[in-house]
Amino acid sequence: PLSLQLNAEANSAAFIAIAEALGKIAGGLHASNAAAELVENAVNSISNMERNDSIGTHAFAKAAFWLHNGGWEDTRFINKLAALFPEQSTINKRMIAFAMGRYRGPWYTDTLQVNRFLNSLQQEPDTLCIVAAMPVAGRTESALAAEYISKQLSNSDSNTELLVSACRASGKNAGVSAQKIEPLLQHKHLSVVLEACAALSGKQLNSEEINRVKQSMNSLPVAAQAAVVRMLHGQGDTLDVKVWISKIDQNLQPYERLACIRALGATGKSAAICFEQALKNPDILQANAYTEAFIEAHNQKDLEFSDTYASALIALMDRGDIGITALCAAEIRSANLTNEEKTNCNEVLNKHLNNLSLPKEVETANEIIKTINAIGKESRDEIKVAFNHPIDWEFVKSIPRKQRAQILTSKGIIEIELHVEEAPGSVASFIQLCKEGFYDGKSFHRVVPNFVIQGGCPRGDGMGGTDYTLRSEFRLHDYRTGSVGLASSGPDTESCQWFITHIPTPHLEGRYTIFAHVTEGMDIVDQIQIGDTIQRIVMLDQ
């Protein structure tokens, strides 16, 4: 057993791998409330780790990361991590910071321990350490934490990752005032503006602050204006529906319009307008956005459809679009429906499930199955994708070991190196799609600051794929800054969509195939926003 092997392992890499595996197993089992005895054995093995050098610290931090990721709240790990932090190498500090940032237990009420760690963090020069540890400051009521976050927010010249993480922490920390966040609405980087809007949504603004935000609203990028609409709604200040519809009707870029449509759900009495457009709009991405806005408007207590909500969701599913069907299926699970309405929905869901094309539409299929299981008397297993796309090994043999590719985007060039030996099937598919021109003109439809940019969807909303799926190819690569991975909705569902990480994302490891890494152009990755395009992707001669 791994628990017995840990302290006996002399090889450093193997020692770290065993500790991480124990953390993953224990964290995963704890999250699903399973095998309590096995969890305790793994936890005890990690706690009693005998190796106390740099390798031992890194191994302990990795194991603790996965335990905390699974919801482990015992304070013995975070106390040790906080004590270890000050004297470690930068690489160990980063791992400790990521592990502490995943913790969500009672330790945050221990002001003495929290402040001791924050005092160490104030001396830390490494930006990535600070970004990874910033959630700690957001989750405590310590006055020192509020002061630390406010200090980070006040330096508008800080890098984007730091400001984004500080905004997120400020939204959760009641001690950080709206006055500290508001100036960032005028920041030059859209990601910072959007995160500032989200942070302000959790604050109570006074009338002067609200008026100031409204007056400056038209000077903001359109996506930021949409975020401000949501933020103002949270303050009880709802814009007139007609005013916002006039914004949607302006000459906007496609993804700007989608952002405005989604915000329509937060403008007041908009359910009827959103439903009509969701049902009839010929642009399927706009129809999906109107569906999201309709659901939000209804859940914001727009009573227009209080007696006919189930029928409205059924009508939208009958458009036959996989995106709208998935949205409505998820909403049916949480909606307050009568037994008769559940029966009607169940019949419609089964009808649409039978009409889906597999494996291409497996994500929608499994969303429907979750809802059928939740509202009916059936209990179905989610669909597991069968092997359907053999690797062309002759083609793989023709790919140079360190094949590089240039991704030409509307913001500039990103160069990547492909991992053909570690992910042959994924790399072969990617190259073939590039040579076919599949990615030409596709958009980056998803950007999450301090996480990923994602593109390559043929629909443009994340619901599209190829007619085949790929086998997952998990290897021992870490998800670092600039890792290129394949998007999926579960094992062996990878297709054509890919993402690039802004910063290390250890929680993705073992869950998403890494098939490349960025060698040049991370500054371009950081500039990409939703709606920017992939012009083409070319393979470079070796």
Q: Language model features by range: what are they?
A:
Residues 8, 48, 87-91, 123-127, ...:
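Short, mixed-charge aromatic SLiMs
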Residues 22, 26, 38, 50, ...:
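A charged, solvent-exposed segment within the mature domains of Sec-exported extracytoplasmic proteins
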Residues 98, 179, 428:
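Short, contiguous clusters of charged residues that form electrostatic/catalytic patches at enzyme active sites
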Residues 88, 125, 158, 188, ...:
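Single, functionally critical "micro-switch" positions that shape active/binding sites
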Residues 1-4, 13-33, 53-73, 91-108, ...:
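Structural detector for internal amphipathic alpha-helices that build alpha-solenoid repeat scaffolds
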Residues 10, 89, 125-126, 157, ...:
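Residue-level recognition of short, well-ordered coil/turn positions
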Residues 1-7, 28-50, 72-86, 106-122, ...:
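Amphipathic alpha-helical scaffolding segments comprising HEAT/armadillo-like alpha-solenoid repeats
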